[in-house]
A protein has these predicted regions:
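Sec/Tat signal peptide C-region and signal peptidase I cleavage site
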Residues: 15-21
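Hinge/cleft segment of the Venus flytrap/periplasmic-binding protein
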Residues: 23, 158, 173, 271-328
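Extracytoplasmic "Venus flytrap"
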Residues: 25-49, 53, 60-76, 83, ...
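Short, solvent-exposed amphipathic alpha-helices that sit
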Residues: 38-52, 133-140, 161-180, 194, ...
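Short beta-strand elements at the ligand-binding edges of bilobed clamshell
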Residues: 61-63, 117-140, 153-157, 185, ...
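Hydrophobic alpha-helical segments within soluble ligand-binding/sensing domains
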Residues: 71, 126-151, 165, 193-196, ...
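Hydrophobic alpha-helical
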Residues: 76, 86-104, 170, 184, ...
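Flexible loop/hinge segments that line or gate small-molecule binding clefts
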Residues: 93-132, 143, 150, 156, ...
Length: 328
């Protein structure tokens, strides 16, 4: 009888363990905003992750609406509703730290993705080095204008890590061309419409003086292109650069109107989700996304690394058609 009771207890424990392992986990994604294509691609990649499609993960994607206070409120919601893990792409490098701390204090792991936060409490971060992209895009503009003339810089939201680091990279490239003058430098908040308005004003203020346009993302570079065209000017007479590899930018690269650098939203999103599941499962999980085999220089390493650096891919005449073929 005693042996039977022990056997029954063991079987019950095994069933309980199995049920716990199979229990659906709740993961929240808190991107800074969903208006532009890049974050829409990022979100779609999360939703396309095998663990989400199989039902293993219940995923909720919030819209931060480009507002740090909105993101803080969303963290409060996820904490109250006892999410198992959070993926965070903050709008503000400093303001986001309090949100991270509140989640960690509640025992919820936070995985950073795409943009950074000034906090040592992140479990891991999956993203790309924006200083590198800022340097590369500025250098492409400076190379085209022969390291002389005048440029303008259209920045992202002031205080976001991408804006800070890309500007650092922009300045590093500009320091190599001391004869180049920066005529204007303002934010357009990742917005194509805001960038178009800025560029229209600058073209009026500096007629026939602007040679290069450094847009810290593709949307803003595309807005500048629209302003140039609206002014009746030849786009190809300007050196224009952006970052992200959004669909319209790929088309503009193919048309010879700008340069761009692909930021792999899919790798950043799915890598972060694999890490979120890994930590929610207390390490009892093997990554399901194929991104870990795509980038040999970004190994999984047992899910223990603090930073996973997704490489940049310059958009070229040789790869633009292949990249366009991946867009629906």
């Amino acid at each position: 009888m005693r042996k039977l009771l022990i056997a029954l207890a063991s079987a019950t424990a095994l069933l309980a363990t199995s049920a716990a392992a199979q229990e659906k986990i709740k993961i929240g994604a808190a991107p800074y905003g969903l208006n532009a294509e890049f974050m829409q691609i990022w979100t779609a990649a999360l939703q396309d992750h095998p663990a989400v499609k199989s039902g293993e993960v219940e995923l909720t994607v919030f819209d931060g609406r480009y507002d740090a206070l909105v993101q803080q409120d969303q963290f409060k919601t996820m904490i109250t509703q006892k999410y198992n893990a959070i993926i965070f792409a903050p709008i503000d490098v400093d303001a986001g730290a309090a949100a991270v701390q509140s989640a960690v204090d509640a025992g919820i792991p936070v995985i950073g993705s795409n943009t950074r936060v000034n906090s040592d409490q992140l479990t891991s971060y999956v993203g790309s080095d924006d200083t590198v992209s800022g340097y590369l895009e500025a250098k492409s503009v400076l190379d085209k204008i022969g390291c002389k003339g005048n440029v303008v810089i259209i920045e992202g939201p002031v205080g976001q890590s991408a804006q800070i680091q890309r500007l650092e990279g922009n300045k590093k490239a500009l320091a190599e061309c001391p004869d180049v003058k920066v005529l204007e430098d303002q934010t357009a908040n990742w917005s194509r419409a805001e960038a178009q308005t800025l560029m229209e004003n600058w073209l009026t203020a500096h007629p026939n003086q602007i040679n290069g346009i450094i847009g810290q993302n593709d949307e803003m570079a595309l807005g500048a292109i629209e302003a140039v065209k609206a002014a009746g000017l030849d786009v190809k007479s300007f050196a224009i650069a952006g970052i992200d590899g959004v669909t319209d930018a790929l088309r503009a690269v193919k048309a010879g109107e700008m340069t761009s650098i692909l930021q792999d939203a899919r790798a950043q999103a799915q890598g972060a989700l694999d890490l979120a599941i890994f930590n929610a499962r207390k390490g009892d999980y093997k990554p399901e996304s194929d991104i870990w085999t795509t980038y040999k220089d970004m190994p999984w390493n047992g899910g223990k690394d603090k930073t996973y650096n997704v490489p940049w891919t310059p958009v070229t005449a040789e790869n633009v058609d292949q990249l366009l073929s991946t867009r629906k």
